[in-house]
């Protein structure tokens, strides 16, 4: 054994060839600060070996290196800029020394090589991979950019266009694509990986492969003519500006850095990468996006822990076909759980099957599946007008009309047709689960399972625990949601549960602004362009359906009369009374016509102004700051109330439900991350300016206490140790 650290070791493999093996405790390898330091020590040992002829890097895990240890990021991001820059220089000196070894090097890459893992293998001369490879640089999705030389080496290896596509989008690619673009040199079966890598090394050692020529382009300026460079970087900057926008500085910074570094050799180019990385790491956007990643891990880990003692349902059923039922049936079948889809008429069943078939055909068109796979999946969806097969199902989700009487009747009837241990769930979006449970003989086997539309795209499923829902019931439904590829978050029961309960105060803020003379177009523009929502409130109401919102608004007002009962007729009432239900009937805040692709396209409609004039004061202008404050304060206050009342368990789960269920702008990180970034005292000052608008603007006492003591909702993070300590971590 030449060297042994906590996460890697170095040993002779055969005559003159050494192997450096990543083998961290636990299930995966991460390139954390300690591993970088250990790698530097191992390379120091190699530099002393006079009889070294070649080096092979590999992993003892199912994945090579899954990336940096993101749990370290928030503390690293608090390190002063100069210290963070010093540590990056140290880390890059390690990879430079790996790259500069006077012998050929190869990485035998299996599974994931992401982020720092990818940057590590870019420093070797050759890369051999297994078919399950996923390799790439996802850093821009975390609000930063590659910091271990990825933005320098990848463009020089692949060419600017291919590298920009991966780096700016935070992409990873599979084995075939990696081979095609030159990111790896070969793909072999897993059992032949090490032997194959040794064979390549022997060829390089014997002079059959020119490893020095392979290495040289990574040390030099990027080989691009002035015209090629102008075209590549101009196109890349335009595309990034269009897709990422101003709220995500990392992608455009990465492109500009690669452009600036193109004319320099390795050392100067790495200095430019360092100078770009450090300021990005100190942005609120990076903290928010890293926070989302960590919250996502926490939420998924919680679901895994919850379901460890239950069996995932093997057969499911959906009550009520149509778009929603068909979407749920498709998602279940697509992920391997056969499903019975029941409705009371053929027309709805046809609609549900058509929806499932349409989604599968899209997968076929994209080349994700072949005709055989399509036929196999669709054959596991069984449409029926009766309860045939219900005696075999493990879980049933009801997705009928949003009417408590209808839902109770359907659920009570279904309960008589299934096994005593079958779990029933309702896809209701607003009706309290405990109320629906009153119709059942076995309420302990019942809970809520709120999907979001469109089901195949929206990651969140709210799992609602009723007063009598058993732990096993919740666990089974969480297991099914996880199997469907969704992110389940368990909430306690109340009208609207969590997501809709906090959404409707936001709509109330919108209605009050319209009442006071604001223009709905400006509100939408501000909330989309300035705050960052994917849709403004008017457009969102048109998409959700104004009839749906009108009904849900009444349910929420009955559930929370003190805050959500309004004493005036609002824009939603006016449009509903005029039979303007949004995209579903082509008339809402806008008029809708289908474009060439069959998608609804909004157009101005003068009739809306007349309708809104009946429920609004004369038009007047509002500042962007006031629009954002009046829209967001009611929502954030309600989010805080949900935490204080135990409707949602943690700030992390609340923020993920908002991001995954409503599209809360990820660069803000969710309501609690936004609050912590803004500061609770500053938020309180802002909210107090609007207290006169009513109870929705009254800040909950718990938040007032946070403001008084300057306490955040997320646990405070300590800065990482000084850079000298990090080197020897």
Swiss-Prot record:
EC number(s) stated in the UniProt entry for this protein: 4.2.1.17, 5.1.2.3, 5.3.3.8, 1.1.1.35
Active site: 450
Keywords from the named record: Fatty acid metabolism, Isomerase, Lipid degradation, Lipid metabolism, Lyase, Multifunctional enzyme, NAD, Oxidoreductase
Site feature: Important for catalytic activity: 119, 139
Record GO terms (molecular function): 3-hydroxybutyryl-CoA epimerase activity; delta(3)-delta(2)-enoyl-CoA isomerase activity; enoyl-CoA hydratase activity; long-chain-3-hydroxyacyl-CoA dehydrogenase activity; NAD+ binding
Region of interest called Disordered, as start-end residue ranges on this chain: 708-729
Catalytic activity: a (3S)-3-hydroxyacyl-CoA + NAD(+) = a 3-oxoacyl-CoA + NADH + H(+); a (3S)-3-hydroxyacyl-CoA = a (2E)-enoyl-CoA + H2O; a 4-saturated-(3S)-3-hydroxyacyl-CoA = a (3E)-enoyl-CoA + H2O; (3S)-3-hydroxybutanoyl-CoA = (3R)-3-hydroxybutanoyl-CoA
Residue ranges crossing the lipid bilayer per the database entry: none
Chain sites annotated for binding NAD(+): 324, 343, 400-402, 407, 429, 453
Chain sites annotated for binding substrate: 296, 500, 660
Pathway noted in the entry: Lipid metabolism; fatty acid beta-oxidation
Keyword Isomerase: yes
Record GO cellular component, one term: fatty acid beta-oxidation multienzyme complex
GO biological process, one term: fatty acid beta-oxidation
Chain spans, region Enoyl-CoA hydratase/isomerase: 1-189
Location of region: 3-hydroxyacyl-CoA dehydrogenase: 311-729
UniProt function note: Involved in the aerobic and anaerobic degradation of long-chain fatty acids via beta-oxidation cycle. Catalyzes the formation of 3-oxoacyl-CoA from enoyl-CoA via L-3-hydroxyacyl-CoA. It can also use D-3-hydroxyacyl-CoA and cis-3-enoyl-CoA as substrate.
Family (UniProt): In the N-terminal section; belongs to the enoyl-CoA hydratase/isomerase family.
NCBIfam families cross-referenced by the UniProt entry: FadB, PRK11730.1
Quaternary state and interactors: Heterotetramer of two alpha chains (FadB) and two beta chains (FadA).
Protein name: Fatty acid oxidation complex subunit alpha
Organism: Shigella boydii serotype 18 (strain CDC 3083-94 / BS512)
Gene that encodes the chain: fadB
